Amino acid sequence: MSAPAQPPAEGTEGAAPGGGPPGPPPNTTSNRRLQQTQAQVEEVVDIMRVNVDKVLERDQKLSELDDRADALQAGASVFESSAAKLKRKYWWKNCKMMIMLGAICAIIVVVIVIYIFT
């Protein structure tokens, strides 16, 4: 004779409804989600720290570049004024040379005229 069939015990811990394989307890799932979220938050925090460091480095480089640009502007201003002075100096030198050349030509013409008429 066979033993009477026993129905499956209901209310067993971890048993899925319908008699399927038992699922993870709900507390474990929420812990896993919490850990995943915390890992994502830590990753975002690390990325933001790197970004802040990069922004600070960029700010420092921009400050150095601004200082160099100011120094270059000052040098350009000095160069411009000295170039203008040099231009004026050689313009006057050229004028003096032209006056001397004109005077020499005038003297030569006067000498030739005097030589011809005497």
Swiss-Prot record:
Residue numbers on the Cytoplasmic membrane side = 1-96
Question: Could you tell me which residue ranges the v-SNARE coiled-coil homology domain spans?
Answer: 33-93
GO BP: intracellular protein transport; regulation of synaptic vesicle fusion to presynaptic active zone membrane; SNARE complex assembly; synaptic vesicle priming; vesicle fusion; vesicle-mediated transport
Q: What domain of life does the native source organism fall in? A: Eukaryota
| Residues with the Phosphoserine modification | 63
**Matching SUPFAM superfamilies:** SNARE fusion complex
Q: Which GO terms describe its molecular function?
A: SNAP receptor activity; syntaxin binding
Q: What post-translational events are described?
A: (Microbial infection) Targeted and hydrolyzed by C.botulinum neurotoxin type D (BoNT/D, botD) which hydrolyzes the 61-Lys-|-Leu-62 bond and inhibits neurotransmitter release. This is a poor substrate for BoNT/D, high concentrations are required to cleave it in vitro.
Query: Compositionally biased, Low complexity: which spans?
Result: 1-15
**Disordered: where is this region?**
1-38
Q: Which Pfam families match?
A: Synaptobrevin
Kindly list the residues the record flags as site ((Microbial infection) Cleavage): 60-62
Q: Where is the composition biased (Polar residues)?
A: 28-38
Q: Topological domain, Vesicular: which ranges? A: 117-118
Q: Single GO cellular component annotation?
A: mitochondrial outer membrane
Keywords in alphabetical order: Coiled coil, Cytoplasmic vesicle, Membrane, Mitochondrion, Mitochondrion outer membrane, Phosphoprotein, Synapse, Synaptosome, Transmembrane, Transmembrane helix
Which tissues is this protein detected in according to the database? Answer: Expressed in brain and spleen (at protein level). Isoform 1 expressed at very high level in brain. Even higher level found in spinal cord. Isoform 3 expressed in kidney, spleen and liver. Isoforms 2 and 3 expressed in osteoblasts of trabecular bone. Also expressed in heart.
Q: Where are the transmembrane segments?
A: 97-116
Instruction: Output the InterPro entries linked to this UniProt entry.
Output: Synaptobrevin-like, Synaptobrevin/VAMP, V_SNARE_CC
* Family assignment from sequence similarity: Belongs to the synaptobrevin family.
Function text? Involved in the targeting and/or fusion of transport vesicles to their target membrane.
Q: What else is known?
A: Is not targeted by C.botulinum neurotoxin type B (BoNT/B) or by C.tetani toxin (tetX) as their target sequence is not conserved in this protein.
The record's note on quaternary structure and interaction partners says: Interacts with VAPA and VAPB.
Q: What is this protein called?
A: Vesicle-associated membrane protein 1
Name the species this protein comes from: Rattus norvegicus (Rat)
